[in-house]
Amino acid sequence: MASEAPPFWWDEPDWRALALAPAAWIYGRVSGRRLIRAVPPRVSLPVLCVGNFTVGGAGKTPTAIAFARGAIARGMKPGIVSRGYGGNYSGLHLVDPGHDGARHVGDEPLLLARHAAVALSPDRVKAAEYLKSLGCDFIIMDDGFQSARLHADFSLLVVDASRGIGNGRVIPAGPLRAPLTDQMRKTDALLCIGKGNGADFVIRQAARAGRPIYHAQLRPSSSATVAGRRWLAFAGIGNPDKFYESVRQAGGEVVETHSFADHYSFEPDDIRGLVDMARRQGLGLITTAKDHVRLATMPDVPPEFLSKLAVLDVDLEFDRTDALDHILDTVVERFKSRLHG
């Protein structure tokens, strides 16, 4: 099964994008107007929003983790607000990585909770206030840029360098969550992750709008176990090709790949199929940290499968060594100005 985003979204506009243009115009009018006119409620903590222009994977999770680590290194106590995509909690919930499963809270919150307290709620203000009651002094909003349900002191929009914003059309004709011009007006800075020229257009738009542009790479953090081996790599994330490339960067030979939908809930037949395919070709099985979190909390996954499954985690590294600290400083300074202004 492929990603939830239709493949044509990431190609040049074709007849499908043209046929869906009227629906996209309506969607864009509504989403753009909501974004521009919104006056989100505020909390008495500095808030950094890590979002993206499109649906699908761009690198928000490793970016949020990098900022959580950076805040901790400065002596701060960050908390992360998330909607918990893929989970089924409808109220306020503090993620417990030792007991919660991905089916209940989502895979990304489980990963994030390894680094900072994560509060799930459709009411982002309530989640932020709850984290404040736990002693958190810095809020990272995982996604939520377009919903405008919590004021952000700084909105960092993440884009994948190879895919960019796809065909540049709004849902359902393309992957944009709202018209790019409307989103750019509310963007404080752009973070381009990886190598490639797919994001050249959005980078030019950000430059014309006077927005700072940062660059970063995803570096494999466990290369020693990957290098020199032949792999069947599988992933259920927004942009699986990025993961396969990371395996190659870590020195692994990717012989076979198998892509599932983003946040995919694996079935026993899926696991048997992967094991059989790997066994026939003498390959090791490797997946992402996000997929491993889902698999490890599913009741039907055999322990022996998990014990043999390799996991490639990645860390975000800014090209400019002072970039992360500069953004954190800006968030705090804007919060202080808001508080005393």
Curated annotation (Swiss-Prot):
Domain of life: Bacteria
Protein known as: Tetraacyldisaccharide 4'-kinase
Signal peptide: none
GO cellular component: plasma membrane
Catalysed conversion reaction: a lipid A disaccharide + ATP = a lipid IVA + ADP + H(+)
Described purpose of this protein according to its UniProt entry: Transfers the gamma-phosphate of ATP to the 4'-position of a tetraacyldisaccharide 1-phosphate intermediate (termed DS-1-P) to form tetraacyldisaccharide 1,4'-bis-phosphate (lipid IVA).
Pfam families per UniProt: LpxK
PANTHER family (alphabetical): TETRAACYLDISACCHARIDE 4'-KINASE, TETRAACYLDISACCHARIDE 4'-KINASE, MITOCHONDRIAL-RELATED
Species per Swiss-Prot/TrEMBL record: Brucella ovis (strain ATCC 25840 / 63/290 / NCTC 10512)
GO biological process: lipid A biosynthetic process; lipopolysaccharide core region biosynthetic process
Keyword Ubl conjugation belongs to the record: no
Keyword annotations of the record: ATP-binding, Kinase, Lipid A biosynthesis, Lipid biosynthesis, Lipid metabolism, Nucleotide-binding, Transferase
Binding site for ATP: 54-61
SUPFAM superfamilies: P-loop containing nucleoside triphosphate hydrolases (SSF52540)
Biochemical pathway: Glycolipid biosynthesis; lipid IV(A) biosynthesis; lipid IV(A) from (3R)-3-hydroxytetradecanoyl-[acyl-carrier-protein] and UDP-N-acetyl-alpha-D-glucosamine: step 6/6
UniProt family annotation: Belongs to the LpxK family.
